[in-house]
Amino acid sequence: MMEQCLDQNQEFVDLITSERLCGESSNRSSPSYDASGSFLEKTKNLFCSGVFLKGVAHAVGFWNPRKGLRALMAIIVLFLDVYYLFEAVYYAFLCGHFETPLDQWMCPNASQNSSSTHNIPVLAFLHGVELVNILSLVAYLAVLMSNTAFFWCMWNMKCHTSNCMTLEKAYSSAGRSLWVRLNCTLLLFGFSLVIMIVWFNLTFKGLFINNLSISLGIIPRLATLTSCFLFSLITNAMKDCVTSCQAEIRNSINSSLDDIIRIHKHLCEQIFCTSDSLKPWFAIHWFLLAVTAVIYVADMVEFFHKNATGWYDFYQVTLISAIYLYAFVYPSYCAASVTSRCNKMLKELNLTSNDEWDTGHPFHSRTQLALFIQYAQYTDCGFRAGEVTFGSNFAWFSTLIAMCGVGVKVL
């Protein structure tokens, strides 16, 4: 009897469960549920992929399999860079001092006083140039040189595909967490720049050509940010190579010390080849953005007090300063993280005791491990800028340089 009751209860439970499952399946099969679930899933997958960064990189000419389109977009971006540098030079040294046919486009707000400036001494003329105009000139020069150097490095990296970490390899090895972080930063700066342009066009009514010129100014800055994101993508792939090297070393059973050294040597060749290919951009970008970041931070408060007329000026100066600070500091930390990961691998190998290695592994003998650690330390494997390995000390030094602007202003 008890068994019959249990069987009946089990049938009743199975019936209820089947009805619930049918109800849930009917709800899930409804068009509204499928549409919302599919949309959320596609949005999640899109946000965890490199579609945004790859699209922006194609748009600014940094990354495109078709060389013709890549060269065309690069020419457009570099033309804008040169134009804004010329505009900054013109506004700083000619507007209000000399009268030319370009004044109506280049000098919308400058007062013309050309008659009194033809015979003044050069030092007096330079003394009359405002600091904010020099600041703009230095910033556009840094953007032009940085973008040009990155174009050059990406174009020439194809010649070293055997050992170098190219964008294609880095793109295929990137994980979801990296894409989420890069997409968040990219969308944050992108939307902030778009808000700045929309705000400007709604607030200030001027000539169409002037508004268009200011609106297109976000493209060079976006290209500079994109180069930093692509550099982060490459350095992340370099760190993955270190992880793979460490795993290969640990699994090298029944091998000799020379075999382990060859594995590590191949890793160093990959890192050195990639860092040498990016060396022109990294050196130019680091130096010029350091100068720009220090000047912007040092002059930001004073510029706001003297020139700001509302919330737009505060938003613009703060956003541009944040962009230059990020573009200067972030690549330094990316480069230092590669060297730090190499040192961490050696530290973890050194902390492994003899009994943790397999019997056939050469590092089962502590003497062999000590010889390898000594060899690896002399190789100084890590991200190199010239003959200098860029480690964590340089990253902190970059942060100190960025903070020097605040110190200069306080003093």
Language model segments and positions:
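Short intrinsically disordered, low-complexity coil segments enriched in acidic
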Residues: 1-2, 174
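Terminal membrane-anchoring module of integral membrane proteins
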Residues: 3-83, 258-411
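Short, isolated positions within intrinsically disordered regulatory regions of eukaryotic proteins
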Residues: 67, 109, 156-159, 183, ...
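Helix-loop-helix junctions within predominantly alpha-helical proteins
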Residues: 81, 85-146, 159-230, 243, ...
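Inner-leaflet juxtamembrane helices
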Residues: 147-164, 228-244, 324-355
